[in-house]
Amino acid sequence: MKLDFVLNIDCLIGMQDIPAETIDMILCDLPYGITKNKWDLMIDPTKLWQQYERIIKPNGAILLFGQDKFTAKMMLSNEKLHRYNIIWDKVLKTGFLNAKRMPLREHEDIMVFYKSQPIYNPQMTKGLPSHSKGKAIGASIEEISSNRIYGSYKVVENKSDMKYPTSIWKFPKPHPSTAISSTEKPIELCRYAIRTYTNVGGVVLDNCCGSGSSLIAAKLENRHYIGMDNGFCDNKKSKYYGMSWADVATLRLDGVADWK
């Protein structure tokens, strides 16, 4: 299978050429269908899932960005595969024109879908040592406990200062003064997601890749990539204005050193 390329094509057509069960991760910022922009048209979820479910590996992860009603629609479009959501804290706030009518917006959703347990590499962070669990006098540290969900389990004290990640990922959104696209996602966020749900050498697909941030992230993390997009850069302040997103992504990828 050909790898490490970007196509200027409708993704519903382009994905038909990807062999079944060959993709380790789909990381995509689909159009939400919430603005009046010509490119912001929601892709038919039924047709999208037909391709996604065909090409993703049985233990592959599908991560889709979303917000508000679009998140709800996508979750309900495949309740069987939807597992949980991650909150992306964008740090930069938006929605100032409506600040007196509703809270400023500071987050987006990242929906996680999969068929069976995917690769999961928790990105540990250093923090304060874990405190001891309160115990009755004379009780063993390794006493047997139980709950309604997991049944019986053994309590083992852990004083490590390494912390597991939570469901909130904090990465600054690209500032409007430097962003190529209004919906551009930070490369570091994409790198974090790719490290979490794939191993080195895995294949990452972004079927609405825009300026290619997710593909750059894959290349930086020593993963293969496939990108698709049939739109063009409409940011008049960008040096890429008028270019197809496929060409923009390819140019940006050319500036990233090969890892092979």
Model-derived features: where do they sit?
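Short, conserved SAM-binding/catalytic segment
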Residues: 1, 243, 247-260
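Core catalytic lobe of class I
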Residues: 2-228, 232-241, 246
